[in-house]
Amino acid sequence: MNEIEKIPKGYHSITPVLIVKNGDEAIEFYKNGFGVEERCRMKGPDGRVAHAELKLGDSVFMLSDEYPEMKCHSPKTIGGSPVSMYVYVDDVDSIFNKVWNSR
């Protein structure tokens, strides 16, 4: 029997999942602004993003549209978020300008 890796290759012990109001728009924002690599995007029957994986540097993060019927709400819907993410990049000024201009 094959052994299953406890932490999948390319992942870390903690992998954030972002719940957003418009998954497709958010994915394009992260791709255009931060240069993330889109690893996969799976849609539900209604067209919402059910699961997406994005990679920036050596880190993977996941993203999905909000699913209120499963109590998954975006920060926009609930009026904020108790969670923050720190993103480390080589040239912060360049990335800031790119993100600012891609809004």
Which functions belong to the PLM regions below?
Residues 1-17, 27-28, 34-103:
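Vicinal oxygen chelate
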